[in-house]
A protein has these predicted regions:
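Short, surface-exposed patches at the edges or C-terminal ends of soluble domains, predominantly
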Residues: 2-498
């Protein structure tokens, strides 16, 4: 009898072990199958309790450091419609949710108001509001108007379907602006035929904390409040004191930089189509930057246009993908940049022999040039419809030169399309973060570099920490095993004493 009982116990124990192993195998296979299908078809579960995107700790950290301590008069977030209308609209409810989270975090500072602009047109005009979907951020007499579109990012070529939510950054930037009325000014030069495809670069500089203004450097001196001077897509040269003009813009620029000024110069392969800009090119050579030209068979000076069919998002190879240098200060500055870096219709920057290589940088006296963005090694230069040059190292697309004796900075970008709406506001590109990081490296403080947009296709669990997610996974595996084990013990005990 003892032998028979022992065999039964062994048999039942074996069944229990087999069931336990079987359940473990099923759980593992189910987990692997669901994971594979989720990755293949983009399945995800939004774990946010409100089914919306919560404000991140990074954003709260920015507000704690740069906004809340200065908001003595309080911050008002004004939605320009009735509350029920805002909540009923799915898109606007995203924005309202973010505002409510901020108001809950800072109840003594941030207040939410609802204003029907159709019933109160006078108040709407005072703020400059033109649509009921606008949102006003105000502090005392200072205010900023955000359009509904400002809170979202859109993919290239699609202005209707947003790809990411940009709410916390838009609110943080607007709040920073209204509590900092003495913000530095970024002046855009306008007397060299400059033209902008859109306002994306200005919006990016506003995000960085600048006010925007324009400057005719031929008629006026560079103002004392100029925190940044920008020349974007010029069609003509800067003037120098010669027989043609008694006013030298070059001298004004030099005097500005001698006092620690910051200068950004954006050009493209089309900039020098009618020939070089002798004055500004000669001056920039002193800062380590020259632009490559080629003289054609008929003696016509032609500007290099960079092409790389292996690293391009267009078939012609002229819409380049840039890369961060692997050495030098540029690699350190841009170490945290992710996303695709796009530079189209770019010309070639060449560093003159007066600058000596030094661990990835180039040095001349008190000035150091750091490449920030380069092409891949396979890129080549074309001019006049023919290939004219190729280098094993690739070409520099963006450079930053700094003078340690004056703290002046000169950033040169060889692609105007690096700073247009499609790249600065399009989802998936890292151009905006790159630009903000460059401004920070130039000395601009309080730049919201760490504030990120939140993609709608994001499968990140925003609420759970990694440790919490791991504990839940362990529990989901262990609980079925524990249940089967307990059940098996109960069966064995009942049979033992039956």
């Amino acid at each position: 009898m003892a032998t028979t009982a022992s065999k039964k116990a062994l048999r039942h124990g074996g069944v229990t072990v087999a069931l336990t192993v079987l359940i473990l195998v099923v759980v593992i296979l189910l987990n692997a199958s669901v994971t594979t299908l989720a990755m293949r078809f983009g399945w995800y579960i939004n774990m946010n309790p409100t089914m919306l995107y919560p404000v991140t700790d990074t954003c709260y950290g920015y507000l704690d450091e740069f906004v809340i301590p200065r908001a003595d008069k309080g911050i008002r977030i004004i939605f320009c419609d009735e509350e029920e209308n805002i909540r009923a609209d799915v898109t606007q409810s995203y924005v309202l949710n973010t505002a409510e989270e901020m108001a809950a975090k800072y109840p003594d500072t941030v207040k939410i108001e609802f204003l029907n602009v159709w019933e109160h047109p006078k108040i709407a005009r005072e703020y400059g509001v033109t649509a009921s979907t606008s949102v006003v951020v105000a502090c005392g007499e200072e205010s900023r108007v955000c359009t509904l579109r400002d809170f979202f990012l859109f993919p290239v070529g699609d202005s209707e379907n947003p790809s990411a939510y940009n709410g916390e950054k838009r609110f943080a930037v607007a709040m920073k602006a209204v509590v900092s009325p003495d913000a530095p000014v970024a002046y855009f030069t306008l007397n060299h035929g400059e033209s902008t495809e859109d306002y994306a670069l200005m919006y990016a500089l506003t995000d960085a904390g600048y006010m925007i203004n324009y400057l005719d450097a031929l008629s006026f001196d560079i103002p004392e409040d100029c925190g940044l001077l920008v020349s974007y897509n010029p069609a003509r040269d800067f003037t120098s004191a010669d027989g043609v003009s008694g006013i030298s813009e070059i001298d004004k620029l030099d005097a500005y930089l001698a006092k620690g000024g910051k200068f950004m110069y954006f050009v493209s392969a089309d900039t020098f189509a009618a020939g070089g800009f002798e004055n500004i090119e000669t001056y920039l050579a002193g800062w380590g930057v020259t632009f490559a030209h080629d003289t054609g068979a008929e003696g016509v000076e032609e500007c290099f246009a960079l092409r790389d069919t292996a690293h391009s998002i267009t078939t012609d190879g002229y819409t380049l993908l840039g890369r961060i240098p692997s050495a030098g200060r540029g690699s350190e500055i841009m170490a945290d940049i992710d996303g695709v870096l796009r530079a189209a219709n770019a010309t070639a920057i060449r560093i003159p022999d007066t600058y000596a290589p030094s661990n990835g940088d180039y040095v001349s006296g008190t000035r150091t040039l750091s490449p920030l963005l380069r092409t891949y090694a396979g890129a080549e230069a074309w001019a006049g419809g023919r290939p004219v040059d190729r280098t094993a190292e690739g070409y520099d697309l963006v450079t930053l030169t700094q003078d340690r004796s004056t703290n002046a900075s000169v950033l040169v970008c060889s692609s105007t399309e690096f700073a247009i709406e499609a790249t600065l506001q399009g989802g998936g590109y890292g151009n905006a973060a790159f630009l903000l990081t460059a401004l920070e490296a130039m000395g601009k403080t309080e730049v919201p570099v760490e504030l990120k947009s939140q993609p709608f296709s994001d499968d990140t669990i925003h609420i759970l920490t990694t440790a919490q997610a791991r504990n839940i996974t362990i529990a989901l595996v262990a609980i079925p095993v524990l249940i089967v084990t307990v059940w098996g013990l109960i069966v064995l005990i009942r049979r033992r004493f039956a």
